[in-house]
Amino acid sequence: AYLARIEQAKSNTVHRSQLACGNLAHGFAACQPEDKASLKSMLRNNIAIITSYNDMLSAHQPYEVYPDIIRKALHSVNAVGQVAGGVPAMCDGVTQGQDGMELSLLSREVIAMSAAVGLSHNMFDGALYLGVCDKIVPGLGMAALAFGHLPAIFVPSGPMASGLPNKEKVRIRQLYAEGKADRQALLEAEAASYHAPGTCTFYGTANTNQMVVEFMG
């Protein structure tokens, strides 16, 4: 049934070459002149970029510069790239024990729907999904499957460099639990462990999902 749906989408989905002129003009109004000319001519593929960038979460901060890098790479192969939409990204490491954690699983569906909104404009010939971590990758995966007639590639953000060794972090936590280290010492240890952009420095769901999409190609 799914494959039949995708075949139907291939034949029934309106391609940008079939969009009304007003629709198409809206779709490339903000593009650079060269990209605008390419999209007018229909001679080059247009690739959607769906990004989960935010600069609060270490795993998603690197995506700030990805769209420009991707556009340059696409230009080198005579294609165009547009950021079609952004999706939310949250971290259980921040919300754990707080009310915000109640939104964690729900965010997967929100991410899928947010990506679908961006792809719904029918301007694209393929899609790149910029996301990592345990709710973001599944949400983007759901969107990629819903738009399975568009070739898709997932782009992980990469791991955080190793910081404070886990044994040392555990030692400081134990001292804090025993009342032998204060909150400032504990915070310094945690900050030395999670200390830079990239996915968390342990084998958790962020790195697991990153490896899954890389293994899948």
Task: Go through the PLM ranges and name each one.
Residues 1-217:
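Metallocofactor- and cofactor-centric catalytic cores in central/energy metabolism, strongly enriched
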